[in-house]
């Protein structure tokens, strides 16, 4: 990738361009790379690139960097000069006959002579079959060729008044297109609800309609011992952001999978609800490290052990008495 205004032929000599090619930095950030190497105190040889700063851009016309290779100006031909176009002959009058229908009081057709020039002769045009009557655009070109009438039609594109299929149609340019839908949310009664296709937005409730009056007023009832709560619990609304609010797995990945259990003292397994840091309680340190090796003893027989102050989230810190783990301080 080279920068826009510094091309390889525009640098004097080849040593600086060779250094630029071998440079580990980006070609655009060349000057920054040289400055970076200079601040890293690599070699004092890098100072020879300080002359690069005094070189102006080759585009400023006050200090022009001489180029070893002359750049030729591309030949430019103005647009309106025709090439290899035969010069038309003198305009010869051509008489054509058009049949124009008129009102019934006159004879049905009238012969109207129309004089044409070669430059305005009507050219037969080919229109795609699916096209109906379409306005025609006349292209005025600067070339002396006869004016070509181009239909204002793109093949496969039907404007609204031609297709007449309603306002919701978009032109599909030759592609088989179908309307896509949003990802669906399952019924809020089911847990995940495979194979469910509910309405994307449930209908809003209608306002209550007035009811006819009762034929007789209800009889008074004795007061209930527990009156109904004045604020009933609202119905659970379906979650409209179900796809974006769903829980995602942690970017770290799952933690270590360990069978969490205590030594079976009571004769039945107690491994329900045991958190990970209480897994080695009551085990000796060697057996616990066979199961989970990243265990560090922080306190042994009531004496603090010297530890490093680094943070390793997988390391389990533990207190022992007689090499048997009695307390765990968690992961840090």
Curated annotation (Swiss-Prot):
Residues 159-256 are annotated as: Disordered. GO terms for cellular component: virion component. Keywords: Virion. This is Uncharacterized protein R610. It is found in: Virion. It comes from Acanthamoeba polyphaga mimivirus. Residues 201-231 have a biased composition (Pro residues). It comes from the Viruses.
């Amino acid at each position: 990738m080279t920068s826009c205004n510094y091309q390889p032929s525009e640098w004097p000599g080849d040593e600086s361009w060779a250094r630029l090619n071998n440079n580990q930095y980006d070609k655009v950030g060349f000057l920054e790379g040289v400055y970076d190497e200079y601040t890293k105190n690599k070699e004092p040889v890098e100072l020879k690139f300080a002359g690069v700063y005094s070189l102006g851009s080759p585009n400023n016309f006050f200090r022009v960097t001489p180029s070893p290779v002359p750049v030729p100006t591309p030949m430019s031909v103005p647009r309106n000069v025709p090439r290899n176009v035969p010069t038309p002959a003198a305009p010869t009058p051509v008489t054509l006959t058009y049949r124009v229908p008129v009102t019934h009081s006159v004879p049905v057709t009238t012969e109207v002579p129309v004089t044409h020039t070669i430059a305005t002769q009507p050219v037969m045009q080919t229109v795609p079959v699916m096209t109906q009557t379409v306005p025609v655009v006349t292209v005025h070109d600067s070339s002396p060729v006869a004016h070509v009438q181009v239909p204002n039609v793109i093949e496969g594109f039907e404007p609204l008044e031609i297709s007449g299929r309603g306002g919701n149609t978009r032109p599909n340019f030759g592609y088989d297109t179908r309307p896509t839908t949003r990802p669906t949310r399952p019924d809020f009664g089911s847990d995940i609800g495979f194979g469910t296709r509910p309405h994307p937005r449930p209908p809003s409730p209608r306002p209550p309609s007035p009811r006819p009056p009762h034929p007789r007023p209800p009889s008074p009832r004795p007061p209930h011992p527990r009156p109904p709560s004045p604020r009933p619990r609202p119905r659970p609304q379906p979650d409209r952001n179900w796809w974006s609010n769903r829980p995602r797995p942690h970017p770290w990945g799952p933690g270590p999978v360990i069978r969490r259990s205590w030594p079976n003292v009571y004769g039945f397994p107690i491994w329900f609800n045991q958190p990970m840091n209480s897994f080695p309680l009551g085990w000796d340190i060697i057996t616990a490290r066979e199961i989970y090796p990243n265990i560090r003893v922080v306190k042994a027989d009531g004496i603090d052990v010297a530890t490093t102050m680094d943070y390793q989230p997988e390391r389990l810190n533990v207190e022992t008495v007689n090499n048997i783990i009695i307390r765990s301080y968690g992961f840090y």
